[in-house]
Amino acid sequence: MVNPADVPIEVSKVFDTILVLDFGSQYSHLITRRLREFNVYAEMLPCTQKISELTWKPKGIILSGGPYSVYEDGSPHVDHDIFKLNVPILGICYGMQELAWINGKGVARGDKREYGPATLNVEDSSCSLFKGVDHSQVWMSHGDKLHALPTGFKVVATSDNSPFAAISNEKENIFGIQFHPEVTHTKQGKVLLRNFAIDICQASNNWTMENFIDTEIARIQKLVGPTAEVIGAVSGGVDSTVGAKIMKEAIGDRFHAIYVDNGLMRLNETEQVYKTLTEGLGINLTVVDATDLFLGKLQGVTDPEKKRKIIGNNFIHVFEAEAAKIKPASGQEIEYLLQGTLYPDVIESISFKGPSQTIKTHHNVGGLLEDMKLKLIEPLRELFKDEVRHLGEIMGVPHDLVWRHPFPGPGLAIRVLGEVTREQLKIAREADNIFIEEIRKAGLYKDISQAFAALLPVKSVGVMGDQRTYEQVIALRAIETTDFMTADWFVFEAAFLKKTASRIVNEVDGVARVTYDITSKPPATVEWE
């Protein structure tokens, strides 16, 4: 058992860490994911990070790609203090050009752009970065290229359009590659990244959820102390449940969970959540039925952003009121608020591109901190979704809940397009239940990352028996993804869709037509609103 007094508050001080400096590439988060896949902890920070402000020393540094040109005014550049750390450095695409620019400025616009697959020709197989890597397909995505070899570097690999597709200065342990090893289109990309992290950086591959849980429990105990009380909102989803379970293991009944039933949940959801969290996991849970309040506030509202804000604001009011009723047996005041932040949320907030135009308002309990004067505790903020699931299984969270598809904070309010009424919710609930039921019967539930039925605000002509009908339309959506930052639509067999559509039209009153959404993310988001 880990002694709480011996555990640093920062995970990067516990595990060997590769630092990924993000220059704004759409692939930057994949670098972090790939490293963790072979149990090396990696953390992403913006390329503007001042090295002097780091409170920990990385085992190695990776400079990501980016949509800029190093020679243009206003382009981002890395803090040159990275070279004072004397750790291995790998530059990818823009990151390689940044290294070349710093070491001689030999970067210019290419004669032609190189996007897509290319054949990599390894010229120097003795390079430690390319151990086990041979001539193979790689993924290129660049318009600029090196036109001269930087001082102290040698050519390791070429492509038809890139005479400097890979370069190295092994004396200084600095490497540059023009292609993207983090994407699956680069056939031996994982081998290359593993060589860098484990062989060159000598990072320990001890980043496992088994090691994380002991460290995290001790970290929570150190942060919270022996007497402080913690509250947290739970939804029955894997993130909030695993977060609640960690708190239960760390501080026992000093953690108080609150479940707000807003009337926008899936079929029989509240009953299932209560049974799982109390009887199954022993969590101290309070359930609040606020259905009438939420549906009353949503009456007549059709704009999705307004719906989200109404739900978020009223959630805060209900949560605050219920939290005020909690009187810990210890006599202590509530000091901390549990929040289920995951690492993709962190990446989104620190990406070098910065906060972009608001696509959707995130439904969380951030507003509670200022209102309730609570300190935040986020036990899952270093984890990707798949890591949270693995952690849940280790901690004894029921398998069905661990692998349950995500459900949005605003619930069915953003799956009922247009005004939310009890009647519309009933249609959406029943259609969704049939869809998920058929997915489970087909043995596809675990193959699909998220699936749901959305009720559209349009009507369509149909025929039931000898009668003409004019009823609503259900849109089915199912996606595949590893991190929910990008997603592809799931390809069902036609027979499955035919059976599901038939059941929905015949069993759900008010539905005349069923469609299937075949849009990927991007350009679409997962949810319709």
Curated annotation (Swiss-Prot):
XMP binds at R308, D466, K521, E527. The keyword rRNA-binding does not apply. InterPro entries: Class_I_gatase-like (IPR029062), GATASE (IPR017926), GMP_synth_C (IPR001674), GMP_synth_GATase (IPR004739), GMP_synthase (IPR022955), GMPS_ATP_PPase_dom (IPR025777), NAD/GMP_synthase (IPR022310), Rossmann-like_a/b/a_fold (IPR014729). Residues 17-206 form the Glutamine amidotransferase type-1 domain. Keywords: ATP-binding, Cytoplasm, Glutamine amidotransferase, GMP biosynthesis, Ligase, Magnesium, Nucleotide-binding, Purine biosynthesis. The active site is at C93, H180, E182. It is found in: Cytoplasm, Cytosol. GO terms for cellular component: cytosol. It comes from the Eukaryota. ATP binds at S235, G236, G237, V238, D239, S240, T241. The keyword GTP-binding does not apply. GO terms for molecular function: ATP binding; GMP synthase (glutamine-hydrolyzing) activity; GMP synthase activity. Catalyzes the conversion of xanthine monophosphate (XMP) to GMP in the presence of glutamine and ATP through an adenyl-XMP intermediate. This is GMP synthase [glutamine-hydrolyzing]. The lineage of its organism: Eukaryota, Fungi, Dikarya, Ascomycota, Saccharomycotina. The gene is GUA1.
